Amino acid sequence: MGAGPVIPTRLATVRRRRPWRGVLLTLAAVAVVASIGTYLTAPRPGGAMAPASTSSTGGHALATLLGNHGVEVVVADSIADVEAAARPDSLLLVAQTQYLVDNALLDRLAKAPGDLLLVAPTSRTRTALTPQLRIAAASPFNSQPNCTLREANRAGSVQWGPSDTYQATGDLVLTSCYGGALVRFRAEGRTITVVGSSNFMTNGGLLPAGNAALAMNLAGNRPRLVWYAPDHIEGEMSSPSSLSDLIPENVHWTIWQLWLVVLLVALWKGRRIGPLVAEELPVVIRASETVEGRGRLYRSRRARDRAADALRTATLQRLRPRLGVGAGAPAPAVVTTIAQRSKADPPFVAYHLFGPAPATDNDLLQLARALDDIERQVTHS
């Protein structure tokens, strides 16, 4: 009889635990889903126009749109990758040309097969790959195509942002759109397109009307797109990594943790030893800084009397040893001695050395100049 009530009690305990177990499992599932979502939606770093970068200047959105519309996007990280991926039926997109500084690599890039799309090229890259073009003179920018290019007319109005404009040199047959911000011509058996800005192709620039359409029309007019947007200098002048790049990421965390331990130990030892004791130490300050600081203080408080006393006292301290006059000599004796040495009028000397305080800032300035003249005359007498 005594063992009978135990079984219902245990069942009740198990039933009470089951809801908590379900809540914990639900919270764990939510945490896992949130972690996966955060990982998948986290911004992917990269340089400007990089097809994997999700920053505002990256090209991930355009690369994704092209892939969804059946274009094979091949990412090239080097000139060798471009040469391996380029084909006669492909389009080569070249951006971030400020990193293309090696003429030999530019020559190799110019020989890559297929059509070419140059995005905001530098003068070096433009000269090497499209010598038929030059920068046009500044003119009112036009957001409408105003040309016969099919890709531009389908897109319509485009917000370019800051952009270069181009014009042909010589007798080149050139199709110019948007006031020269987009040009196209045929050379050496391939079609070359040059745009003066990359803003309309970036993640942050696709939203305005016409931008995404023009970007897709230009980059997606071939079934295969080779995307080359370097983020470092390649070739003999290359220096893409530094010594810190060779250090594993975990080492940085370890260093920060060690610093934290040192800080905690310092706080612990400091509490055991006691508070710090202030000790007066000599401080060396330039004389000019002291004078300027004291002058600003006097001026802010309109303490012209104190400033005049300081000037007169300093002048007398420098003149007494030169004149052989003691510190306790009366004022008339000092005035007489200085007047004789400097050939100055005694009332003039007495007024400026022992006279009343100046009434204005200009009077104080005149006093300083007079004291300087008196000291100079005594020194050179």
Swiss-Prot record:
Assigned keywords, A-Z: Cell membrane, Membrane, Transmembrane, Transmembrane helix
Keyword S-adenosyl-L-methionine: no
Pfam families: DUF4350
GO CC annotation, single: plasma membrane
Chief location: membrane
Keyword Glycosyltransferase on entry: no
Location in the cell: Cell membrane
Annotated signal peptide: none
Protein's membrane topology: Multi-pass membrane protein
Transmembrane segments: 22-42, 246-266
Cross-referenced InterPro entries: DUF4350
Protein name as annotated: Uncharacterized membrane protein Rv3691
Gene source species: Mycobacterium tuberculosis (strain ATCC 25618 / H37Rv)
